[in-house]
Amino acid sequence: MSTKFKYFTCLIIVLCSCYPAPKVTGFDQDQWDEDLIECRNYRAMQAAPLLINQKDIVLGSNQNEIIALLGSPTKQRLDKRNRKFFFYQLNCENTIELSIRFNAIGAAKEIMLIN
C-alpha cells in the first residue's frame, strides 16, 4: 500500500469524524452547560424556547451534532425500529425535559418539551 493512499485514508477518516454543532441564534452553550449546577433556569426559560423556535436548524442534525451543541443527554432510549430518543434535563427539580427523537439513520426528526 502506498504512503499517499495511507495519508489520504487518514485524511478522509479525520474529516468524516468532525461534526460541527448547529448554530442556534441566541443560544449560549456555556450557560447551558453550567445551568444544572447553578440552577438559574437558563435551560427551561431561555434555551429550550430558542431550540423549539429554531427547530428547523436542529431537525435534520445527526446525533453527534446534537451532542456537540447540547452535550451528552441526561437519558437515552432506544425505541422500535432503531429510533432513538435523547432527553435533556431542563431544571434542577428534573420536572421538565427536552426530548429529541432520531430516526433509524440518526437524523433528528422531532423536538419537544415534556412535563
Task: Go through the PLM ranges and name each one.
Residues 1-2, 19:
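N-terminal hydrophobic targeting signals that begin at the initiator methionine
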Residues 14-17:
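C-terminal motif of bacterial Sec signal peptides marking the signal peptidase cleavage site
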Residues 3-10:
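Sec-dependent signal peptide recognition
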Residues 19-115:
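Residues within mature, well-folded domains
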